[in-house]
Amino acid sequence: MVMKSSVEEEEGGWGLGIPEKMRNNANWVDVTQEFKGACKELKLGELLHDKLFGLFEAMSAIEMMDPKMDAGMIGNQVNRKVLNFDQAVKDEAIRVKDLSIPELIGIMDTCFCCLITWLEGHSLAQTVFTCLYVHNPDLIQDPALKAFALGILKICDIAREKVNKAAVFEEEDFQAMTYGFKMANNVTDLRVTGMLKDVEDELQRKVKSTRSRQGEQRDPEVELDHQQCLALFSRVKFTRLLLSALISFTKKETSAVSEAQKLMSQAADLLPAVHATIQYGIQSQNDTTKGDHPIMMGFEPLVNQRLLPPTFPRYAKIIKREEMVNYFSKLIERIKSVCEVINITNLHSILDFFCEFSEQSPCVLSRSLLQTTFLIDNKKVFGTHLMQDMIKDALRCFVSPPVLSSKCSLNNNHQAKDYIDSFVTHCTRPFCSLIQIHGHNRARQRDKLGHILEEFATLQDEAEKVDAALHGLLMKLEPQRQHLACLGTWILYHNLRIMIQYLLSGFELELYSMHEYYYIYWYLSEFLYAWLMSTLSRADSSQMAEERILEEQLKVRSSKKSKKKKKARPLSKEITMSQAYQNMCAGMYKTMIALDMDRKVRKPQFELDSEQVRYEHRFAPFNSVVTPPPVHYIQFKEMSDLKKYNPPPRSADLYMAASKHFQQAKLLLENVTSPDAEVNRILKVAKPNIVVMKLLAGGHKKETKALPEFDFSAHKYFPIVKIL
């Protein structure tokens, strides 16, 4: 039987045959002759088409045992014997004791590189577990290597647990499968950190004993020994600090997050020493049989090849040691940034923090740590605050609804309390989902934002009904007060933010063609930002009205005249930023229309679709939203038709109008007190665009056939227009 011979070959080369249990339970039948007989019934070139085997199955089918298609067959192509840990120890191919310091440094650095490659989306079997030492650390007799191997396993285990718990990864981000390997679960976290500390203390003594005394003649050998001990000490301490920081994130107290931040700062201080001593470690020899996977003592890239499913061979390119320190440096900065979230108490500020953090395109581990720090196992924010309380605080800050004011008669009304409590409870899940969405990678975020609009549309409907019910109750108790569109305004604000983010992220992900820019920028400037401005103004007015009522109540109680102080409006900066964004979008819309008039926008020859099909596809997720109502293509064409103006504007007029919009955005942003990085980024686009638009309005390069260039390097949503 063909299968039998391949099994024997496999057992000889790999020691991984069919498990005994499977052999005993299965009733193996040889179908070779029966299959060949059935094949004879087919004519030459004829294929059997089963209804369960369609085009999709054909495209994803794997021809097993073909080296080009089956990852498990790569092992048969190498001309060396692939050994597992036990075999390698038995054959003395690797040592478990009496390792030199350069060997330890080389093994540790390669292990760090494998750890990073795993965090970047490759499988454990092709990265960390290519290091034979982590297969069974109990057999290692060298204390430094044993403690390090256990430390790496614990780091992997906690990272895997955190990423799984946060659930903000997709198949392209992370592979959590452990392939049956033990993750040092027989040893406690405390024991491993203790072992690393013991090794660290021993190495520190060696570092001190080999240190040069002042004015002493230095022996080159002693100096080299000192540098090597220091290099090993830095790596062991770094492993302990990284592990201790991850352990801190598993605790429920917020003080543990502050502790993790301190540990990360200490770890960052060790990185220069690690980087400076990379050359002291033994260097890997490139695997000449397959790419450039590092082959060195203790590592076998093909040891787990048969554990991989029969898929197209995926080669894991292990990062270089020089890049390792840079990656760890950025990871530490991201984790330190994650720790800052516990200092934020306002829900809107937390949402902004998640958005800003996500814009850096952070790794899956730091994204997951942020999620699990925000919402701990007990479903409380930072383990202490109820999400419902945070939503109520956000409502008070944004729109000051009378029902949440302690000085309002509704505050003691049981029916009103039931209305608002029920509404806030219904808000909890969509807002938790919205925060979780910002933990996904940027491409997946966009897709999920489109889907969550449906939940917010339902909330919008409920908010309007609750507002109406509360207004009815309030009119009976306090006729001078209103409760119109308070909750509705707040939900509408979040609805608009999601819609704006959905459209803008398309520029970042490079989803739009140049000929589509004009209707995307039109929708943003004329519609979404116009609605957002109106919503923010309404929220600001609502706040002011509530403040006036409270001031009048205080005047009645106190006969003293209070000094009037000009109070800073909480929403003023957001209103200014929204105006600036609206002007930038309007400027880009008019620029695109003018460029199209001058025949400087390349348009496709539509065959299977049309502009209407593309337009409807781009705005399809907005169809589930009632407020604001979606603008359909025919409406858009009517609203943006230039022929309704008399006389219709020429391209020069539109360039000049675009220049004025960019100028207005510049003026608004230059008046922002303490401008942040985003303000400066927009100014970098607005200033050159003002100049370019004025040049184009004056007829500059009008006759040139060259198409304009859109440079998104300064800002990911608004390009600098370049005329070549």
From Swiss-Prot:
Q: How does it assemble?
A: Component of the N-terminal acetyltransferase C (NatC) complex.
Indicate whether Cytoplasm appears among the record's keywords: yes
Choose one Gene Ontology CC annotation of this protein and give it.
NatC complex
One GO biological process term:
positive regulation of cell population proliferation
Function, as annotated: Auxillary component of the N-terminal acetyltransferase C (NatC) complex which catalyzes acetylation of N-terminal methionine residues. N-terminal acetylation protects proteins from ubiquitination and degradation by the N-end rule pathway. Regulates cell proliferation during embryonic development.
Q: Does Cytoplasm show up as a keyword for this record? A: yes
The UniProt family comment states: Belongs to the MAK10 family.
Q: What transmembrane ranges does the database entry give?
A: none
Q: Where in the cell is it found?
A: Cytoplasm
The identity of this protein, by name, is N-alpha-acetyltransferase 35, NatC auxiliary subunit
* Domain of life of the organism encoding this protein: Eukaryota
Looking up Pfam families in the UniProt record yields: Mak10
Tell me, in one coarse class, where this protein mainly resides: cytoplasm
Keywords attached to this entry = Cytoplasm, Developmental protein
State the InterPro entries in the record.
Answer: Naa35/Mak10
